[in-house]
Amino acid sequence: MAGSLREIKAKIASIKQTSHITGAMQMVSASKLTRSEQAAKDFQIYASKIRQITTDLLHSELVNGSSNPMLDARPVRKSGYIVITSDKGLVGGYNSTILKAVLDMIKRDHDSEDEYAIISIGGTGSDFFKARNMNVAFELRGLEDQPSFDQVGKIISKAVGMYQNELFDELYVCYNHHINSLSREVRVEKMLPIADFDPNESEGHVLTKFELEPDRDTILDQLLPQYAESLIYGAIVDAKTAEHAAGMTAMQTATDNAKKIINDLTIQYNRARQAAITQEITEIVGGASALE
């Protein structure tokens, strides 16, 4: 019985130590989430402005009806997928949901590796696709908690360049969209060709008047890739925010479960201790009775 009590007590101590770790990780993730949410809000200011400028420009008389490879759909021979996952675990179902969605989509829409290419951001996704011998064109690991454009700009520019060079004919970004600290949703958004401009968006505000220098095509050739890159970067910031929220929720769940186990073990320990004391009393009384 004494051995059993020691084992239970050791388990309680071990789980308490684990709960302290998960509790600390929860607080760290909460802090990262707060910073990521602010970064996402700050980026939206830039994103909304460049979208407004691009929308006004495309619907102005100077460029209305113009053709550009970034805007024009072409026959799809090969599709590109930017898939955003985390580099580490302990984020609940954050990675599994997006990876399952991408895997199902590729199996449904493509018959061979020649029909798609994956651009993986995050080590978990890279390892997942490589283990299944899927076509990973290139990857980026070790993303910062609040990734700057400088860190991801190269891979984003490379993805847009592959589209411009017709290495694939459409580009999707697959990621977890952050809704709030408790929920997220899988999104697969078509980034290229750019086709999400609504003519009605320009209603309600005065259109910007443009004077184009040096010429229309040069302006579009520079502006449209920059706009596409901003969309992709926005998805990365959004995905990172969802990752921190998932990590916080997972660690909170782990801490709550640890507390429940500690409570159950404490009850078990008290019952075992009470049984041991009762047994000792019974033995003492029995021994005293034998001496009479």
Curated annotation (Swiss-Prot):
PANTHER family for the chain: ATP SYNTHASE GAMMA CHAIN (PTHR11693), ATP SYNTHASE SUBUNIT GAMMA, MITOCHONDRIAL (PTHR11693:SF22)
A Pfam family that the UniProt record links to this protein: ATP-synt
UniProt keywords, alphabetically: ATP synthesis, Cell membrane, CF(1), Hydrogen ion transport, Ion transport, Membrane, Transport
Cysteines joined through disulfide linkages: none
Protein family according to the UniProt entry: Belongs to the ATPase gamma chain family.
The keyword Zinc-finger belongs to this UniProt entry's keyword annotation: no
Highest taxon above the source species: Bacteria
GO cellular component: plasma membrane; proton-transporting ATP synthase complex
Topological relation to the membrane, as annotated: Peripheral membrane protein
The name this protein goes by in its record: ATP synthase gamma chain
Any one biological process term the GO annotation gives: proton motive force-driven plasma membrane ATP synthesis
Matching SUPFAM superfamilies: ATP synthase (F1-ATPase), gamma subunit
Subcellular location as annotated: Cell membrane
Membrane-spanning ranges: none
